[in-house]
Each structure stands twice: as structure tokens, then as C-alpha cells.
Amino acid sequence: MPIRTVMKANEAAAWAAKLAKPKVIAAFPITPSTLVPEKISEFVANGELDAEFIKVESEHSAISALVGASAAGVRTFTATASQGLALMHEVLFIAAGMRLPIVMAIGNRALSAPINIWNDWQDTISQRDTGWIQFYAENNQEALDLILLAYKVAEDERVLLPAMVGFDAFILTHTVEPVEIPDQEVVDEFLGEYEPKHAYLDPKRPITQGTLAFPAHYMEARYLVWEAMENARKVIDEAFAEFEKKFGRKYQKIEEYRTDDAEIIFVTMGSLAGTLKDWVDKKREEGYKVGAAKMTVYRPFPVEEIRELAKKTKVLAFIEKDISMGLYGAVFTDASAALINESEKPLMLDFIAGLGGRDVTFNQLDEALSIAKEALEKGKVEKPIHWIGLRKELL
């Protein structure tokens, strides 16, 4: 029987790793994700998880160790955040290029400088071009479930790419919520044994991994990573469907909320989706035709789902906890690219909010709604990007 309990998202991530039965875990502690490897080390020390736990001196070493372990043919896991993920950047490309389905939990935290240990998405968003699949959790249950789904998708032979699962620093990592821990037997049926055919070290089958590629071969190698990410679109849908059958919880790349007659739809990710849905309920009671959409999968970017969502509304607005310096928020930019060749598309707005752990309040969302309403009334967007919740007295 599944176990109903309460726990932090960090603990939920550790339980997900335990259920997935990785053989090698390598990690270096960093706020706010330290509890994940701490809990896993307890599982290993207590004999509850048969795995090698490698204590390393940096996040760069942690991901490097997992590249070697995954190339040797075993399931692997790690967790990090913020500057730790940034330190891994060099090796993230290597893991994807070598087609190693490593899974990593991320307590989404702001990047320095200034130093900040609280939540936004800049750490994972900054890794969007590395070839890693990216999932974002709204709550602690999703943190557990999406790690299991990450293994399911990453290890599929049509994909064979690493994956990361982000959940918001402190808002989720250190907050206790109800979580259902699934049966080990059901998880075993869902994931199966990891038996790689493409990459493993075997004296009877000598191969070279991570070798030099000359111009005559390099481009094809990069194409295959791109193709695998495209393949992941279908594999993710299949994994979501199978997960629902086995565990009873439904996931979608984009989950819609009260969008059927919405003139304005706000899109976001992570725990902010819960706030947004509550705010939509309040605005509906006040007579506003607004809806919400939560993006669970950011890479591969849900192009078709965004196109379908765009057909339902007159204004599509994004609330995001990241910024691509010199342009807009990354999610808005990607969505704009997805819609560029559509003959009809809604007005589009981007709202930057909640950076460095600043609360995103109903008042801030009201500010965004006011701007969206003005664009709707005028039939045009005069300024696509807006920062909401700024303390202008500090500027």
C-alpha cells in the first residue's frame, strides 16, 4: 500500500531516488538542496538503498563522477542548486552529448551576485541549452513523481538524455506538505531495470566514449541530441499516461485552469502556479475572464501545447522568475518563437516577478492584469516586458 505522510520537497526527492534504486549517488552539499543527499546517505547507511554514495569536493566533481558511473552502465542520481549547478555547467553538455540518462534534483535558487539563497528559476533556466530535459514541480508530491518520470523518460531508448527536476527553494524544499510514497513494487514495474545498450563499460565490448569529433562528425552528434530531445515529446506523453494508470495522478506538459472562456491567460511554472490558480478564482468571482496555465515541462519546450493554448485567448501573459539579460524572460521568448509562424496569435506580455525569493502577491498579479487589460482594450502591446513587485525607492 502507498504511504500517506507529510514531508519537505527535499525529503520527497530523496524518497523518489530511493524508489528508483540508483546504484551511484554523488553529491556536494549546497543550500537549499543539502537535505536531499543527506537523506539518501541515511538510506544507504541504514541498508535501505543498495548504492555507492560518493562524497566529493565540489559539484563539478559530483556530476563528473556520475558521467563515469552512468557510462559504466548504472542508474545515477544527484542534487544541487544555484551556484552548484552553474559549476556543473561544463559537464552538463558532456552528459547530454554522451547520451547518459542521469537524473538530478534542483532546489531552484537565485544566482549570485548579490548572493541570495532564496527562490527563482535562473539556475535551471540558464542550463536550457545543455541538452537536459527539464521538469518543474508545483508541490512536494510533484517533486517525488517527476523524479520518477524523469528516469522513465531519460532512460527510454528513443531519448537517452539526462533530466533535471526543479522545485522552488524554501517554498517547497523546506516546507512540509502531504505526500504519497508509492509502493516499491509498482515503481519497479514502472521503471524496470536500467539495462543500457548504448553506453556501458565492458572488457568484452571495448568502445570509446566522449572521444574527439572532427568537423566531419561533430555536427551529426549534435543533431542526434536535438533529435533525441524532439523524440522526448512523445515519450513524455506516454510516460505521463502510464504514470496515471499506475499511480492515479495525472500530469500534462501544460496544465490549464479555467481557460475555456478566458480572454487573458497567465502562464507560469513551479509553486507559483498554486498562487496563480487561487488568484484566478478570486478574479473570476469579481467577473474577470482570466485563466491560468502551468508549464510542467520546459525542455523540450511544449511548442504544440503553447500553440493550442494560444488559440483559446486574446492575451497570453507569462509570469516568470527569470530574466535573459538583454531581452525578455526565457519562457516568454521561447513561447514567442513557438508562435512566430502562426497566422493568428494573441497579444503577448511578459512579467518578471519573484526574483531572489520575493513573494509574488495578489496585488502584483492585479498589476499584471491591469496591464493585460489595457493591451486588450487597445488591441496592441506597447511594451512587452514588465517587472512587477519592484521596490522603486531602491532604484
UniProtKB/Swiss-Prot annotation:
GO BP, sorted A to Z: response to oxidative stress
Transmembrane segments: none
Coiled-coil blocks: none
GO molecular function, one term: pyruvate synthase activity
Keyword field contains Oxidoreductase: yes
A Pfam family: POR_N
Enzyme class: oxidoreductase
InterPro entries named in the record: PFOR_II, Pyruvate:ferred/Flavod_OxRd, Pyruvate_synthase_PorA, Pyrv_Fd/Flavodoxin_OxRdtase_N, THDP-binding, Transketo_C/PFOR_II
EC assignment: 1.2.7.1
Annotated S-S bridges: none
Subunit and interaction comment: Heterotetramer of one alpha, one beta, one delta and one gamma chain.
Name of the molecule in the record: Pyruvate synthase subunit PorA
Organism: Pyrococcus abyssi (strain GE5 / Orsay)
Gene this protein is translated from: porA
